[in-house]
């Protein structure tokens, strides 16, 4: 039975310059681990499309995995001078380094789940990040055009505490479990999907990842099953810390999160060993 581990990194996770404190450092190390252990990286949108079509080889073979990034800060795409920890090699450039390290090249694709609202991103960047304009959407089309990236939805505004004043309808913020009725789901999911398809159309625009990895029964059992065709979303991802299988719930697909589900090269090796059983 095919099993696809989906590994998740956050470009904004830079609290130092070692594996435990920096997702960029962790990704570079993890790519070497993946290669050493004989795993291959497959594009997530293509794997999901094959899975939904009933292709028995949807995972792309044995010992395959997919890579995702969350939030879509510019640390995903651009090398940036972190104010405390120096220049950071972007997540996608780290993938490019891995691809180009061998003369024949190696497959290395990732899907970045982005916060779609520009107003929200600019506000949170200003008051909660570095206030340097490092949460933009100017690179999304370039990422898609590279052939090594997909851009997918991480909701309209992440239902983020710092963006509460920009939200039109009251709800509890800092959690996605509060998105539990149609109007709120339309604001967070349908609006984001429609806008992303306009500004950066690509195979990833049919995928959604829940902010905070949080689902609820309304979204999983009612909203997505009834509205997915209309809003153009084919699958949704949580953070269930197990490999995706053919029997997985289409609206709560699992992912592993760096720093939570593994914290070292040895931890990733153990995770992959368990995932392949």
State what each model feature region is.
Residues 18-19, 122-125, 162-164, 218-222, ...:
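A short acidic (Asp/Glu
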Residues 164-179:
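A solvent-exposed, charged loop/short amphipathic helix patch at secondary-structure junctions
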Residues 46-48, 155, 176-179, 199-207, ...:
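His/Asp/Glu-enriched short active-site or ligand-binding loop at hydrolase and phosphoryl-transfer sites
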Residues 4, 151-164:
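Short, solvent-exposed beta-strand-terminating loops
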Residues 259-277:
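Low-complexity, Gly/Ser/Thr/Pro-rich intrinsically disordered linker/tail segments
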Residues 11-148, 159, 197-198, 204, ...:
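Active-site beta->alpha N-cap acidic-glycine motif
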């Amino acid at each position: 039975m095919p099993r696809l581990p989906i590994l998740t990194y956050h470009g904004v996770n830079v609290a130092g310059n070692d594996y435990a404190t920096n997702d960029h450092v962790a990704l570079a190390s993890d790519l070497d681990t993946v290669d050493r252990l004989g795993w291959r990286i497959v594009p997530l949108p293509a794997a999901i499309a094959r899975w939904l079509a009933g292709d028995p080889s949807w995972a792309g073979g044995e010992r395959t995995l997919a890579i995702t990034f969350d939030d879509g800060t510019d640390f995903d795409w651009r090398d940036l001078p972190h104010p405390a920890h120096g220049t950071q090699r972007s997540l996608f450039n780290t993938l490019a380094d891995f691809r180009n390290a061998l003369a024949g090249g190696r497959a290395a694709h990732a899907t970045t789940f982005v916060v779609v609202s520009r107003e929200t991103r600019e506000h949170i960047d200003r008051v909660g990040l570095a206030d340097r304009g490092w949460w933009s959407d100017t690179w999304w089309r370039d990422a898609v055009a590279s052939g090594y990236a997909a851009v997918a939805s991480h909701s309209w505004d992440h239902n983020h505490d710092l963006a509460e004043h920009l939200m039109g309808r009251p709800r509890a913020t800092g959690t996605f479990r509060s998105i539990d009725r149609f109007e709120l789901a339309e604001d967070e999911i349908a609006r984001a999907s429609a806008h992303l398809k306009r500004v950066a159309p690509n195979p990833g625009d049919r995928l959604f990842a829940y902010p905070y990895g949080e689902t609820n029964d309304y979204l999983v059992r009612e909203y997505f099953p009834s509205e997915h065709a209309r809003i153009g979303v084919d699958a949704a991802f949580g953070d269930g810390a197990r490999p995706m299988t053919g029997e997985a719930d289409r609206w709560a697909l699992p992912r592993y999160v760096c720093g939570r589900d593994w914290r070292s090269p040895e931890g990733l090796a153990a995770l992959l060993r368990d995932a392949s059983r």
